[in-house]
Amino acid sequence: MKGKLYGIGVGPGDSELMTVKAARIVGEADIIITPKTEKKDGSVALNIAAPYIQEHTEIVPVVFPMVLDDATQEEGWQEAKRIILSYLDQGKSVVFLTLGDPMFYSTYMYVYRLIENTGHEIETIPGVTAFCAIGSHLGYPIVEKEEVLAIVPATAPKEKIDAVLAVADDAVIMKVYKNFDEVQETLIKHNMADDAVMISRVGLPDEQVYVGLDNMPKDTKLNYLSTILAKRKDR
């Protein structure tokens, strides 16, 4: 009997934002795969899912190198594939946890592609994205009527972000942690900084909220889990 792989989005931080289905499957799992980096111990996704994990479940941390080198990344994905397949071949139910939604800026997508043609059943359970949680948490409408919404990673080239914000009415900027000064500059240029909001680690105990990004110090230190919502004032 072959096992089954579940990709589960645990949402942005609050365990109660996990879907009923996600919580049930986590509670029934034989194996839970928790992605981690080489530099950090622990897993935010695992902590979010923890209230639903049963004693019989085995937790298996898998390292995914946070590097730009394609060969090193591929090596990490292949190792994850090997580990997951070893459990699936034993008939185990395997859960791969991911923050937010599994198909939105997630490591799970790469593992999914490697395993989808191996003959094993896969089911992906959606989760609440950080930007949707922030909009609801702060009462900040993300996009309205015929407005155009842009979703961009702050890690993209500056000129690419600039071009996108030039035509967008509203913006979601993900992964704001290393280059806040460049992002801030671009938001100011396109008249989107004054009413912008940013949350680091939304739904977690150490959540930080920033309202109005035009006057924030350029050297502000931010967590990797930081997201900006912005609107153009002249439209």
Where are these regions (language model features)?
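Solvent-exposed alpha-helices and their adjacent loops that cap or buttress functional pockets
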Residues: 1-2, 24-25, 88-89, 96, ...
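Class I S-adenosyl-L-methionine
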Residues: 1-15, 20-22, 27-120, 209-210, ...
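A contiguous loop/helix-start segment that scaffolds small-molecule binding in enzyme catalytic cores
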Residues: 5, 165-235
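A polyampholytic, Gly/Pro-enriched intrinsically disordered region
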Residues: 79-87, 142-153, 215-226
